[in-house]
Amino acid sequence: MKSTFLWTACVTPFNCSGDSIDYQSLQRLLTMQAETENGVVLLGSTGESLSLTDSEKRTLVEFVCELKLNTKIIIGVPGVNLYQTLEWLDFCKGMPIHGYLMTTPIYAKPGIMGQTLWFEKLLEKAHVPAMLYNIPSRAGVSLHAETVRNLSSHEKFWAIKDSSGTVDTLTQYKKVAPNIEVFCGDDNMIPDMAAKGAAGLVSVAANVWPSVVHEYVKQCMSGENPQADSWQQACKTLFTASNPIPTKALLHDIGLIEHKTVRLPLSTEDLPSIETLRQANKMILGWKELTNS
């Protein structure tokens, strides 16, 4: 797992009406990621996992595993109901995957011991390494540093995806659990977090620009800071509406997915403008041409 410094948090393409998954578009996106040697994260928030039925999630995982992609696969693990989550882990045990992304329990706002006991249950069930996910803006509570300390010796606890929005959180995690890798969970923060010891990036932007993001993160990890202002400006356009609305809109605009459809409660009508995304795409492709020249 340590050789993978870029993981793409993949979108789940739908048909026009949104009532089924567009597997042809999904295969196209995943093939691009594999060709660029990016790991893939399926069924996270970018993949609209909470909007999928259990049957759809199982079918999606089976479909992706049957593709036999030459890349590593992480599967999202929901943080809602313990027993349903354990059942999901039971299903995934039979799949040739490489890791889990385990979200901090949402809505309930558990404290240190609640989080510790929750993750202990999940880690005991896991058959592959797990990346815990700190996403306070969605979960309603942070993954506490003391929780990380309590779990740091578990053999299945491999890494953290930190989407706290501050470098200080990474520093706290590294202090209490120096053996645990911490990945940046915000595209625009990778220059700063790489400088503080991040192991890599779990990226939304790599859905659209897989090879460019791969090269950019590689440079950041080697100590360079290539055009951080332009990079951050472009990445922020992917969050002008709730993720993954802008990303799907741009993927559709450049012909990588057939439809920009998202499922309720998300709506494409909340996207302010496609023009901002087109300008960001132009900026990123310009950076690619500059670095290749």
Curated annotation (Swiss-Prot):
<dbReference type="GO" id="GO:0009089">
    <property type="term" value="P:lysine biosynthetic process via diaminopimelate"/>
</dbReference>
<keyword id="KW-0456">Lyase</keyword>
<feature type="active site" description="Proton donor/acceptor">
    <location>
        <position position="133"/>
    </location>
</feature>
<dbReference type="InterPro" id="IPR013785">
    <property type="entry name" value="Aldolase_TIM"/>
</dbReference>
<keyword id="KW-0457">Lysine biosynthesis</keyword>
<keyword id="KW-0220">Diaminopimelate biosynthesis</keyword>
<keyword id="KW-0963">Cytoplasm</keyword>
<feature type="active site" description="Schiff-base intermediate with substrate">
    <location>
        <position position="161"/>
    </location>
</feature>
<comment type="similarity">
    <text>Belongs to the DapA family.</text>
</comment>
<feature type="site" description="Part of a proton relay during catalysis">
    <location>
        <position position="107"/>
    </location>
</feature>
<dbReference type="GO" id="GO:0019877">
    <property type="term" value="P:diaminopimelate biosynthetic process"/>
</dbReference>
<dbReference type="InterPro" id="IPR005263">
    <property type="entry name" value="DapA"/>
</dbReference>
<dbReference type="InterPro" id="IPR020624">
    <property type="entry name" value="Schiff_base-form_aldolases_CS"/>
</dbReference>
<dbReference type="InterPro" id="IPR020625">
    <property type="entry name" value="Schiff_base-form_aldolases_AS"/>
</dbReference>
<keyword id="KW-0704">Schiff base</keyword>
<dbReference type="InterPro" id="IPR002220">
    <property type="entry name" value="DapA-like"/>
</dbReference>
<feature type="binding site">
    <location>
        <position position="46"/>
    </location>
    <ligand>
        <name>pyruvate</name>
    </ligand>
</feature>
<dbReference type="GO" id="GO:0005829">
    <property type="term" value="C:cytosol"/>
</dbReference>
<dbReference type="Pfam" id="PF00701">
    <property type="entry name" value="DHDPS"/>
</dbReference>
<comment type="pathway">
    <text>Amino-acid biosynthesis; L-lysine biosynthesis via DAP pathway; (S)-tetrahydrodipicolinate from L-aspartate: step 3/4.</text>
</comment>
<protein>
    <recommendedName>
        <fullName>4-hydroxy-tetrahydrodipicolinate synthase</fullName>
        <ecNumber>4.3.3.7</ecNumber>
    </recommendedName>
</protein>
<comment type="function">
    <text>Catalyzes the condensation of (S)-aspartate-beta-semialdehyde [(S)-ASA] and pyruvate to 4-hydroxy-tetrahydrodipicolinate (HTPA).</text>
</comment>
<feature type="site" description="Part of a proton relay during catalysis">
    <location>
        <position position="45"/>
    </location>
</feature>
<dbReference type="GO" id="GO:0008840">
    <property type="term" value="F:4-hydroxy-tetrahydrodipicolinate synthase activity"/>
</dbReference>
<feature type="binding site">
    <location>
        <position position="202"/>
    </location>
    <ligand>
        <name>pyruvate</name>
    </ligand>
</feature>
<keyword id="KW-0028">Amino-acid biosynthesis</keyword>
<comment type="subunit">
    <text>Homotetramer; dimer of dimers.</text>
</comment>
